[in-house]
Each structure stands twice: as C-alpha cells, then as structure tokens.
Amino acid sequence: MTNLRKTHPLMKIINDSFIDLPTPSNISAWWNFGSLLGMCLIIQILTGLFLAMHYTSDTLTAFSSVAHICRDVNYGWLIRNIHANGASMFFVCLFLHVGRGIYYGSYLYKETWNIGVILLLTVMATAFVGYVLPWGQMSFWGATVITNLLSAIPYIGNTLVEWIWGGFSVDKATLTRFFAFHFILPFIILAMVVVHLLFLHETGSSNPTGLNPDSDKIPFHPYYTIKDILGLFLMIIILLSLAMFSPDLLGDPDNFTPANPLNTPPHIKPEWYFLFAYAILRSIPNKLGGVLALLMSILVLLIIPLLHTSTQRSMAFRPISQTLFWMLTANLIILTWIGGQPVEQPYIIIGQWASISYFTIIIILMPLAGMLENYMLKPKFP
C-alpha cells in the first residue's frame, strides 16, 4: 500500500499534499483555517447542490420555493440553515485566515497571497449573488443598490448596469443570471483553491517565528491531520449550534418579506460580513470616490507585500507592529458596527474617521513601524 501511495499518479498528488507533506513543527492553531475554509467550501457546495434541486429562479416563485424547501422538503430547513450560516462561518474563517497572513508575514509568499486575495474577492462576489436568490426585500434592494454602484464608472457606467440587470431594473433576468453565477462560481473557487495550494506547496508553510523552518519539519499526517480534525469538529459544532438554535441571528428580518419594488426598506444594508466595506463606501460623499474606496478596501491587501519594511518576517517579536495590527482589528470591528447603523450623526463622522485610519494604518503606519523596529534593533555601541 505504501508503494502504491507513492507511485500511483493520483495517489502521489494526494500523498505529497496531505500525507508526506513536510510541515513546520511549530505552526499554531492559526494555521488551521486553511483546512477549515476547504471544509466550508465543500459544505457550501453540497448544501447548495441540494437547495438548487428545489429552488426556482423566477421572480414569481423564488421566495415561495425557499419557503417550500424549509416546510416541505425532508430536512430542507436544516440544509437551508446550514447553507445560510455556513456563509457566515466561511467569512469568519476567511477574515481570521487573512489576519493570520498579515500578522505572521505569510504575504511574502507573493503568488500564494495574490491568488488568496483574488479568492477573497470571488467568494465575496459569490456571497453577494447568493444573497439575492431568496428574493426577499433586502435581497432585491441590496442587489439594486450594489449593482447601481457600477453606474459611477465614467462613460460606460449606465450601459454596464443595464447589461448586468438584463433590463431597466432588477427583475427576472437579473435573478436568473445571478442564480447561474451563484451555481458556477463555487466550482471556479474550487479550481483557484487548487492553484492556491499549488503555490503554497512550492514554498511550504511559514511559521509563527518567521524563521526558515527547513531544519525542523514533520510529516503532515498524522500530526496535522489530527489537529485539523479537532478544528473541524469545533467549527461544525459552532455551525450546527447556529443553524439549529438561532438560524436567523445573522440574517435581516426584512428578508422575510417578499421583494417589492414599490416599497423601500428603511435601512438597506448587506450581510454582516460586508458591513466594513459598506461603511467605507458610505463614508465618502461622492459616488465614484465611494466605489473606488470600496474596491481599495480589499485590493489594498495586494500591496501589503510591497509595504513590508521590517527585517523580520513575523510580527511575533515586533511589539509596535503588533499594537498597530490590533488597532486595525478594532478598527474593522468599528467599521462593521457603523455599516449597520443609519446614515446620521455621530455614525457618519465615526465611519469617516474609521475609514481614514483603516488605510492610514495599512499604508503609512505599518511600514513606518517596521522601519522604527529595524532602527531599534541596531546595536548602538561603538
């Protein structure tokens, strides 16, 4: 069996990726999130497939087909709740995974990092089109508001919006194509995940110290398979608790009302995992400026490797950078809170300051902190 595992063309790929993979001996639980994200993706694809068997992408029947799934399909309520809350778990793991990458300098593996940022954008796009499918009030108005942002693009904006809508408003054509996108994108994500892993396995994992781990590596199996399974069980317990005991905790009550183009909800807001970007969008009083800031809030991750000034890779031994990192984390929590509040004082000014500090910390303060720490580490004696 050992021989086959190492010689069979397919088994060899699996063996080199998940069994005999040399892994640093000191990677912490922060390195669990990659496998958790893989599991989230599998859960979402499977539950989504079963939902798609019963869902109809028509404006007249979409809302009632979701109700039918929850009421009449065997365990339909569970499948739907796991799928809806699985998206939240996906984003929790994503944010922690990206945060780990920033803290421990994983972004210096540039190919892996860049593919990861593109993956993040693709997952966000998938979640957005998926949120439109139940065709509730917030689905409809969320789709209307967010797609309308593209009209800020000079010259081609309005044409582009109507092209995406498939008409002059969000309607049947929009819902049908969003369902098509939502079905195909997870498989594109799956392919990109393979590329992400391919680039990662070219260099191997980083580790909490930021030092070269080649001198002390252990096989992935059994050490990290066991560790990943523990993380997986914890995640599944949290996901099932959420899906079974409070499935609507993270949703919007407006989505229990069927979509009505004649009635606007009092506060249009996206799902919680987009609120930080939505707050940045709203903090700029100009439409095009807001759209650019929204894009930059994610795309700024692409320039993080270029802004690395420290002689050390990880933040483990850099207290000033650590302080800035946790300030950035707090800042993102504030932005998430602001994104869910109405557009009135004091929320407007808090959102604007939080947006400015978000970009300032990443683009200006973190590189300066790296330079300062380098200076402080230089021997001062003659």
From Swiss-Prot:
Keyword annotations for this protein, in alphabetical order, are: Electron transport, Heme, Iron, Membrane, Metal-binding, Mitochondrion, Mitochondrion inner membrane, Respiratory chain, Transmembrane, Transmembrane helix, Transport, Ubiquinone
| Superkingdom as given in the UniProt entry | Eukaryota
Give the subcellular location.
Mitochondrion inner membrane
Would I find Lipid biosynthesis among this entry's keywords? Answer: no
Q: Name one GO molecular function term.
A: metal ion binding
Chain ranges passing through the membrane:
33-53, 77-98, 113-133, 178-198, 226-246, 288-308, 320-340, 347-367
UniProt-listed InterPro entries: Cyt_b/b6_C (IPR005798), Cyt_b/b6_C_sf (IPR036150), Cyt_b/b6_N (IPR005797), Cytb/b6-like_sf (IPR027387), Cytochrome_b (IPR030689), Cytochrome_b_C_euk/bac (IPR048260), Cytochrome_b_N_euk/bac (IPR048259), Di-haem_cyt_TM (IPR016174)
- Binding of heme b b562, residues: 83, 182
In the bilayer, the protein is annotated as: Multi-pass membrane protein
Please give the cofactor(s) recorded in the UniProt entry for this protein: heme b
Q: Offer a single GO CC term for the protein.
A: respiratory chain complex III
Binding-site list for heme b b566: 97, 196
UniProt-annotated binding residues for a ubiquinone: 201
Report if keyword Iron-sulfur is assigned: no
Q: How is the cofactor bound?
A: Binds 2 heme b groups non-covalently.
One of this protein's Pfam families, by short name?
A: Cytochrom_B_C
Biological process (GO) annotations held by this record are: mitochondrial electron transport, ubiquinol to cytochrome c
User: Which additional comment does the entry carry?
Assistant: Heme 1 (or BL or b562) is low-potential and absorbs at about 562 nm, and heme 2 (or BH or b566) is high-potential and absorbs at about 566 nm.
In the record, the note on similarity to other proteins reads: Belongs to the cytochrome b family.
Q: How is the quaternary structure described?
A: The cytochrome bc1 complex contains 11 subunits: 3 respiratory subunits (MT-CYB, CYC1 and UQCRFS1), 2 core proteins (UQCRC1 and UQCRC2) and 6 low-molecular weight proteins (UQCRH/QCR6, UQCRB/QCR7, UQCRQ/QCR8, UQCR10/QCR9, UQCR11/QCR10 and a cleavage product of UQCRFS1). This cytochrome bc1 complex then forms a dimer.
State its role: Component of the ubiquinol-cytochrome c reductase complex (complex III or cytochrome b-c1 complex) that is part of the mitochondrial respiratory chain. The b-c1 complex mediates electron transfer from ubiquinol to cytochrome c. Contributes to the generation of a proton gradient across the mitochondrial membrane that is then used for ATP synthesis.
Q: What's the protein here called?
A: Cytochrome b
**What organism, scientifically named, is this protein from?**
Philander mcilhennyi (Mcilhenny's four-eyed opossum)
What gene makes this protein?
MT-CYB
